[in-house]
Amino acid sequence: MHAAEKPEGTLSSGEYFIRQSWSQEQDFSRPYHVHVPANPDRRKLPVFLFLHGNGGNARASMPAFLRQHPVMAARYVMVFPQGYQNSWNISAERSQADDRLFIEAIVDTLAACDNVDPDQFTVMGVSNGAALVNQLAIETQLPNFRHYVTAVSPLNDLQHDGRNFKAKGDDNGYETIVTPRTGARILTISGSEDPLVPYYGGPSPVIPAKNGKLGFVAAEESIFLWAKAMGYRGAKLEKPSRIDGKLEFFSYLNGTVVHCKVVGEGHGAAGAIDQATLLRFLEHQP
């Protein structure tokens, strides 16, 4: 393992940095941690980025995630960016950075490496990290992202106002209507009993916004909005397409856009999604 400002040539495991300036910092080195498989079975590897939740830590979450996902760790370049002050800037968090730009800079950098497949980037986020994944899916113009995975944070009512997707903007005003890029695969995960992010929509009792508490789109409505954005023209699913124990899957566009309802779980619902379930989605298995 080593630390370097920027990887060049063949990517190896280590800590790297993106330099960024914003209202809180000037020319600040923002870290991200990379794990590259030791003996990969392909020359160019797909990339999986994991975005921690508010209060989380990339360095701490990395070993646990790798341990819980050994098959993925052997097949993917695994990347763990660090949020400024352990947060991602969505509405009223400690970070006021342009976090979309930070993640896009990581993607641009890694996509140029010899052993990376530039067309196979996945980004998964949990809670506050998932809100940033939503922002990326709404706003990014990068062609590299193939999969978006969000856990316990469906679209909030800033990102979709009931009629349109909205870009965050420099002051978190969410005023500009945008059309997300099509062609992505999307998996969303929510717990039916989440006390922080209401499964059936409405304001969070806890999560702050600039004015009051942050509101959320209902989880099943959120995936329907994503399905329509990706080209679906049918009716909203009122019943799950498939049930596997406490997991209820709502699948659109032949499994391209999927919501997983974790019955009885709260804000830790991501823990119910095992490696096999995640790989089934990433590798386009029915």
List each language-model region with its residue ranges.
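Short substrate-entry loop that stabilizes the transition state in hydrolases
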Residues: 40-88, 156-160, 196
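C-terminal catalytic histidine-bearing segment of alpha/beta-hydrolase fold enzymes
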Residues: 186-189, 215-217, 223-286
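Alpha/beta-hydrolase active-site loop
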Residues: 93-114
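A domain-start/cap signature at the N-terminus of enzymes
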Residues: 1-47, 76, 95, 119, ...
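Stable alpha-helical elements in mature extracytoplasmic
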Residues: 47, 61-62, 99-106, 128-132, ...
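Second-shell loop/turn segments in exported
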Residues: 89-94, 135, 209-213, 264-267
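The feature captures the conserved acid-bearing segment of alpha/beta-hydrolase catalytic domains
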Residues: 146-147, 152-236, 250-253
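Cell-envelope and extracellular/periplasmic
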Residues: 51-55, 84, 111, 126-128, ...
